[in-house]
């Protein structure tokens, strides 16, 4: 008997094991709306758990989606007691990192204008690293490491599941490559510090700090993340696309890359569907023409990903902004949209100011 895969995310929304959920795809396909919707549905379905939604996209949209301001520190969504949001700000994170480096350098005996502390006082670290390609992804990765450390120590708010609203595909792939890249880099650093450790400690003004120990601790943290990201019970990736050629092509490329990283991926959200055959009241030649094109690519998606959860989401008449609109829209992730029965809901969003 053939395995029937449900066209919804019900199993993920009610999952008791997942710690990390990534939501990504091509730019402009509705990633933020989808990640917010997943987070809301999980929070509603599991009220005894705490959820965190993090934006790793430099063009942060979580504040716009919910209609309230979020920043670099996690803050509860108004109207929900078990869902928090945060937007990683690279410039603020770099400043914090620079200030921390100054403090540590001064504590370890590198005071003075000629020491490491003096070099960093003017924001040299932030200035140097701010222009490095991929710094946004690296800072996002550091945030993941911080959450793992805090949970291991029992510090701060404990989140059962973290949902990532990721940047467009290229940024996301660089982010997911970081565990492997850092692991290899730290191995090389380990070899160097094994030979030059005392000299490096002296240069850093950190005679009482064993650099090799610090590197080994960092390597252990990176390996922990690698293990968790490749465990399908703990981590999964939800692809988001629209039913057009370029989006379908990029989704396939993304899926192949994720498979090469040994990451679990078995869900696709297809957004902005017209379902024109079932909407005779609001129909036109242009709608029919676009729906015909969408159906062509939907058939290809169904054929290519027959063993995936393919969730088909409607194009709404208005913007999906604010908690109430997101709640209405997100219900179709848990129980698939029925054009004949649910048609009215997509027009209810039209009147939201």
Swiss-Prot record:
Signal peptide: none
Protein location: Cytoplasm; Endoplasmic reticulum; Golgi apparatus
Annotated GO biological process: tail-anchored membrane protein insertion into ER membrane
Residues annotated for ATP binding in this entry: 26-33, 244, 271
GO molecular function: ATP binding; ATP hydrolysis activity; metal ion binding
Active site per the UniProt annotation: 57
Positions of Zn(2+) binding: 284, 287
CDD domains for the chain: ArsA
EC number: 3.6.-.-
Keywords: ATP-binding, Cytoplasm, Endoplasmic reticulum, Golgi apparatus, Hydrolase, Metal-binding, Nucleotide-binding, Transport, Zinc
One CC-aspect GO term: GET complex
Subunit architecture: Homodimer. Component of the Golgi to ER traffic (GET) complex, which is composed of GET1, GET2 and GET3. Within the complex, GET1 and GET2 form a heterotetramer which is stabilized by phosphatidylinositol binding and which binds to the GET3 homodimer. Interacts with the chloride channel protein GEF1.
Similarity field: Belongs to the arsA ATPase family.
Protein task: ATPase required for the post-translational delivery of tail-anchored (TA) proteins to the endoplasmic reticulum. Recognizes and selectively binds the transmembrane domain of TA proteins in the cytosol. This complex then targets to the endoplasmic reticulum by membrane-bound receptors GET1 and GET2, where the tail-anchored protein is released for insertion. This process is regulated by ATP binding and hydrolysis. ATP binding drives the homodimer towards the closed dimer state, facilitating recognition of newly synthesized TA membrane proteins. ATP hydrolysis is required for insertion.
NCBIfam families registered for this protein in UniProt: GET3_arsA_TRC40
Protein name: ATPase GET3
Organism: Zygosaccharomyces rouxii (strain ATCC 2623 / CBS 732 / NBRC 1130 / NCYC 568 / NRRL Y-229)
Gene name of the encoded protein: GET3
């Amino acid at each position: 008997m053939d395995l029937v895969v449900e066209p919804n995310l019900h199993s993920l929304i009610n999952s008791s094991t997942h710690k990390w959920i990534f939501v990504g795809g091509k730019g402009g396909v509705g990633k933020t709306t989808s990640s917010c919707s997943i987070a809301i549905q999980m929070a509603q379905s599991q009220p005894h758990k705490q959820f965190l939604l993090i934006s790793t996209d430099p063009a942060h949209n979580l504040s716009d989606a919910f209609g309230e301001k979020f920043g670099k520190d996690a803050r509860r969504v108004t109207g929900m007691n078990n869902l928090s949001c945060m937007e990683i700000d690279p410039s603020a994170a770099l400043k914090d990192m620079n200030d921390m480096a100054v403090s540590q350098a001064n504590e370890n005996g590198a005071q003075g204008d000629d020491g490491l502390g003096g070099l960093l006082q003017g924001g040299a670290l932030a200035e140097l690293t701010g222009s490095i390609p991929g710094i946004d992804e690296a800072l996002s990765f550091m945030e993941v490491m911080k959450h793992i450390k805090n949970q291991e120590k029992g510090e701060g708010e404990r989140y059962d599941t973290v949902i990532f609203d990721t940047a467009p595909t290229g940024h996301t792939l660089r982010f997911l490559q970081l565990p492997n890249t850092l692991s290899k880099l730290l191995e090389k650093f380990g070899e160097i510090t094994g030979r030059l450790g005392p000299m490096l400690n002296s240069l850093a003004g950190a005679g009482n700090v064993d650099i090799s120990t610090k590197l080994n601790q960092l390597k252990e943290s990176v390996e922990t993340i690698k293990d968790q990201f490749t465990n399908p019970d703990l981590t999964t990736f939800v692809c988001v696309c629209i039913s057009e050629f370029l989006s379908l092509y990029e989704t396939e490329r993304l899926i192949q890359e994720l498979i090469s990283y040994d990451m679990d991926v078995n869900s696709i959200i297809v957004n902005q569907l017209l379902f024109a055959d079932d909407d005779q009241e609001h129909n036109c030649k242009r709608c029919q023409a676009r729906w015909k094109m969408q159906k062509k690519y939907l058939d290809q998606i169904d054929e290519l990903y027959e063993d995936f959860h393919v969730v088909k989401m409607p194009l709404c008449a208005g913007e999906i902004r604010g908690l109430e609109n997101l709640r209405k829209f997100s219900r179709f992730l848990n129980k698939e949209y029925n054009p004949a029965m649910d048609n009215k809901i997509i027009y209810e969003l039209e009147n939201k100011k």
